[in-house]
From Swiss-Prot:
Subunit structure, as described in the record: Tetramer of two alpha and two beta subunits.
Cofactor: Mg(2+)
Residues annotated for L-phenylalanine binding in this entry: T334, Q373, I374, E375, Y413, F439
Name listed for the protein in its UniProt record: Phenylalanine--tRNA ligase alpha subunit
EC number: 6.1.1.20
Entry-linked CDD domains: PheRS_alpha_core
Residue stretches spanning the membrane: none
Gene3D superfamilies in alphabetical order: 1.10.10.2320, 1.10.10.2330, 3.30.1370.240, Bira Bifunctional Protein, Domain 2 (3.30.930.10)
Catalytic activity entry: tRNA(Phe) + L-phenylalanine + ATP = L-phenylalanyl-tRNA(Phe) + AMP + diphosphate + H(+)
Upper lineage: Archaea, Methanobacteriati, Methanobacteriota, Stenosarchaea group, Methanomicrobia
GO cellular component, one term: cytoplasm
Family (UniProt): Belongs to the class-II aminoacyl-tRNA synthetase family. Phe-tRNA synthetase alpha subunit type 2 subfamily.
Source organism: Methanocella arvoryzae (strain DSM 22066 / NBRC 105507 / MRE50)
Amino acid sequence: MDLSINERLVLRSLDLKEVTAKDLASAAGLKPEAAVQGAAMLAEKGLATLRDEVESEYVLTDEGRKYAAEGLPERVIHDALPADGITLNDLKKQFPPATVNIAMGWLRQKGWAKFEKKDGDMFLLPQKADASADEKMLAAISNGESQKGFDAKVIKDLLKRNLIELRETKTKFVKITDSGLAVKQAGIEITEEIAQLTPEMIATGSWQGKTFRKFDVSLPVQTEYGGRKHILRMGMDAVKRTLIEMGFKEMEGPMVDAEFYVNDLLFMPQDHPARTHWDQFNLKEPKYIHSLPQNLVERVRRVHRDGGSSGSLGWNYEWDETIARKLVLRGHTTSLTARYLAKHSKPPQKYFSVSQVFRNDTIDVTHLLEFCQIEGWIMDDNLSMKELMGTFKEFYSRMGITVLKFKPTYNPYTEPSLEIYGRHPKTGRWIEVGNSGMFREEMMEPYGINSTVVAWGLALERLMMINYGYTDIRDLHGPLCDINFLRSVPVVWQQ
């Protein structure tokens, strides 16, 4: 049988009599922890038995040791009481208030003093005070005497006064088994083993001819949880890689932005329900953006009022720049698209972003107050909805989702518009994973863009729900997310 050097030393030192780990370590010439480890390994192989025996005893606390040496406060006060008594006020002049306060209750409880009211003050008259049970117990513990027969009530009182505490001492006992005895009788050879190969040994060649300890790498070990990316961060990285592979460039921009970029440039009227505090988060301080590009401001004003030169009638109201300057937490990353269209107005263009958005929604299995949106848009001449749907099929197929469904819908800033649905692998339910469409001419008018722009906003969490089979978005994101689930998600390495 293959045994380590420590196992051999321990086995050779064992006999039929059970011994403590401390005595075994001394006999084997090992440190106690090394002897226990060797005995435990022998026990796993059936060559020895290892058991724990716990002994409990009461020991004095720091305060208990002080009182055992100097006397309990009630004993100190009693012994200082004059035979004809003393007032409480005079007593407090002789002893610290804390000592007097502790002693008063115990003097009364033990009957060591008689208390009388006299001239508006408390008068203490000493009584007979033989050694009490708690004093005897403190002395016995202090002197290391046997604790058998200790009175339970006295122990409870001393514990309550924090004068003693229960201390448990664990002793390990080791005994050889019949199998271990057979191995021992067959002869145990003690050969020095090396546990670690060092650079110096390699350089000098001193490792040659040495015996190295064998390690069983198949033995179970404690799981170590190191730092790792959150499942959504891994999902974001995968989406970014996929869109970059498809020829897109990434957009970046502020999470706090003016309503001008979040709503007004998207041809969303200022009285739209989605622009109220019921749906979006407004900033209290600062409340407004410092400035807006005035060339765009005037064009947006005209488009909202009468459609400008887009051929539309607009929304037929007086647009308010003050409302447009209000700062909000962006409810979609289309605010980035609104910013980038002003800088990249000549086709062809392909941009995307994957970032957080914030909506004042009711939290349920598919909605959160904060989630990650996959924003994207393509600008080119003569684009159609066919190219848009083809982009989705290509993107989602690369993300592992091949079954999609499209449904016409309405959006203030796209026409025509489509909702995208993916089928959940477990429930079979169709889940809306995004919204899309072709930007309206009213939205393109302020930029002076004559080319077609198709765009979308997709939900990363819902994509992940389909990929991983989860039915509740809160299982992926937020305080209800299971830590064991996060630890068990495979880490996918990609260059």
